[in-house]
Design a protein with these regions (language model features):
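Conserved small/polar residues in nucleotide/adenosyl-binding loops
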Residues: 14, 120-127
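Alpha-helix boundary/interfacial micro-motifs
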Residues: 31, 62, 94-95, 125
Length: 129
C-alpha cells in the first residue's frame, strides 16, 4: 500500500475529539486509529509497536548496520480531529494532477477556496507552469 493510500484510509476513521471531556484521549473512538496504526506498524516489521492507555502509539526500528551510534529519529502526530468539522462518514477524494487552484467537490459542486489568490501566503510555494 502506498503512503497516500494509507492516509486516505486513516482519514476515514472517526477520531473527532470531545471538547467536553476531561479524559485523555477525549473520546474512546480515538483508540480505533491507534490500534489500526499498531497493526500496520507490526505488519511493516515494527515488532514492539504498542498503544498505551493515553492513546499514544510507540514503536522502534533497529538502526541500520553501521549507524548504531547515530541519533535516533522520533515521529509524533495528532490522531484526533477537531470537532469543528464533522469526522464521521468521511469519504476522502484524491484530486490527481491538482493544479493548485480552488477545489470543486464532485458530489455537491461546493467550491473550496484554497488557491493562492484566496490565501496569499501560498504564493511563496507556487511553481511556474
Amino acid at each position: 500500500m502506498r503512503a497516500y493510500e494509507r492516509l486516505l484510509d486513516y482519514v476515514k476513521v472517526y477520531t473527532t475529539s470531545d471538547p467536553e471531556s476531561g479524559t485523555h484521549p477525549s473520546a474512546a473512538r480515538e483508540f480505533d486509529l491507534a490500534h489500526k496504526l499498531v497493526e500496520e506498524l507490526k505488519a511493516l516489521g515494527v515488532e514492539d509497536a504498542r498503544v498505551d492507555e493515553h492513546c499514544y502509539v510507540y514503536g522502534s526500528l533497529p538502526a541500520t548496520p553501521g549507524c548504531e551510534e547515530k541519533p535516533a529519529l522520533g515521529l509524533i502526530a495528532h490522531m484526533d480531529t477537531a470537532p469543528d468539522a464533522g469526522g464521521e462518514n468521511v469519504n476522502p477524494i484524491l484530486h490527481e494532477n491538482y493544479d493548485g487552484g480552488d477545489v470543486v467537490l464532485p458530489a455537491t459542486g461546493k467550491v473550496m477556496k484554497v488557491s493562492a489568490v484566496s490565501y496569499t501566503h501560498l504564493r511563496a510555494h507556487e511553481t511556474s507552469q
